[in-house]
Amino acid sequence: MSEPLGLFGGTFDPVHFGHLRLAEESIAHLGLGGVRWIPAGQPPHRGVPQVTAQQRLEMVRLAMANNARFSLDPSEVEAEAPSYTVHTLERLRRELGPLQSLVLLVGADAFAGLATWHRWRDIFALAHVAVSHRPGFPVEISSLPHELASEFTDRRRADVRGLKASPAGGIVTFAMTQLAISATQIRKLLANELSARYLLPDSVLDYIQTHSLYRNS
């Protein structure tokens, strides 16, 4: 069986170093062969992004340009329908076959809300789920909704090598370097014409400035 493939979805509005570190560290912690970035087109769980889906896609393309282990999947941006994770996973499973191990990368906050996602239980039949958390702050079962806590207990794998042994169905957790960076923070800085340098790649910041993105209208 080939190495597990990480799947990293999000609005990336804009992509920043926190996103890049999560993707980079997941490869080392989880033994992934690479990470496929999947920018959302019309995210159903968030408000409408401030910039177009194509612009967010291009910013991710710029951010990951020099990392051979990163790849870009534009399918959700190109689709006209809202971006539901389970639909994307079904497409990838058809594309990559039943034996490829797929690992959905999510942060602890997003995982806590997993039970609100469309057909969330079906996700485990299609992929593993890897939950990143702050060092010293592991995922607490008591903080999860009952249904999700039950799934977490039943599916949790202590050894990440299990990700390669099966194509889907497990939950693993891993600590990642905590960077106090958020897309909301960056948008506020840019809207107020303050510097966002060193919070995101220079190539992305140059693109934002060239196209006058995130400015107050």
UniProtKB/Swiss-Prot annotation:
Pfam families: CTP_transf_like (PF01467). Coiled coil: none annotated. Keywords: ATP-binding, NAD, Nucleotide-binding, Nucleotidyltransferase, Pyridine nucleotide biosynthesis, Transferase. CDD domains: NMNAT. PANTHER family: NICOTINATE-NUCLEOTIDE ADENYLYLTRANSFERASE-RELATED, PHOSPHOPANTETHEINE ADENYLYLTRANSFERASE. Catalyzes the reversible adenylation of nicotinate mononucleotide (NaMN) to nicotinic acid adenine dinucleotide (NaAD). This is Probable nicotinate-nucleotide adenylyltransferase. The gene is nadD.
